[in-house]
Amino acid sequence: MLRTLFIGVFLSLYILLVGPPLLVYTLITKNPDPVYWAGVKGVMFFVRVVGVRIRVRGLERIPRGVCLFVANHTSSADAPAVVGAIPRRIAILLKESLFKWPIAGQAFTLAHFIRVNRGVRDSAIASVEKATEALKSGQSFLIYPEGTRSPDGRLQEFKKGAVVMAITAGVPIVPMVCSGAHRVMGKRSLVIHPGEILVEFLQPIDASKYSLEERDDLNEHVRQVMAAGLPPDQRPVGFPGAA
């Protein structure tokens, strides 16, 4: 709990000190890079300070150009690991409530993150459509296809929004697998444990080979690839090699 308190206090101070001038700079220059990277590097620094090590593999598999990154979601601890591992500025579909955070919410907006209300179907569809248009215009995205954090660390069923985006925009999907984050911080826990999180980029998948009518096939293919890339205790029950 002390580690969580440390991050909460010092990250809040960091946001208060660094956030306002960067927000003003972004509003004037229309360049979201500084506010984005200040946020990513700041969170990564505090995560490391409390004893969480992050290892990254497979960077050479990331294709040039716009792509859609998809990752499994097991814990609040995997978000900084996954975002920090991606070596380019990306946008994210974030739940609407996060945009209400002071300073951070404004930074999310200026970084072109898109708010989504998962509880309202029409609103969620509109958010996916907006993100798809951003993909088409050259903005890479990160999506958690499970839609929410896994309760036990195992890969869950996927929603179809990510593959619909990739097929419609004609961009490759880059699967990412994150292991160990659920042991660092559980889904319903505020306690941060020291440990290691491994983030691995898998081989990209060419979504342009699929039509929208084949979205279920692509969705299942991406899930199978990610399940195979996870350690046995994070694979879905019944999947080959699952513990």
Task: For every predicted segment, state its role.
Residues V18-W37, V49-V50, R57, P63-R121:
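Catalytic core of membrane glycerolipid acyltransferases/transacylases, capturing the structured
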Residues I125-A243:
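Non-catalytic C-terminal accessory region of glycerolipid acyltransferases
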Residues F46-V47, F108, A134, A166:
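A generic structural signal for well-ordered alpha-helical segments
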Residues A38-F46:
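N-terminal nucleotide/polyanion-binding subdomain common to many enzyme families
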Residues R48-R57, A124-I125, A181-R183:
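Short gly/ser/thr-rich secondary-structure transition/capping motifs
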Residues G58-I62, K130-E133:
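Short amphipathic alpha-helix with an adjacent loop that forms part of the alpha/beta core around
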Residues M1-L27, D33, W37, E60-I62, ...:
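Membrane-interfacial terminal anchoring regions of lipid-handling membrane enzymes
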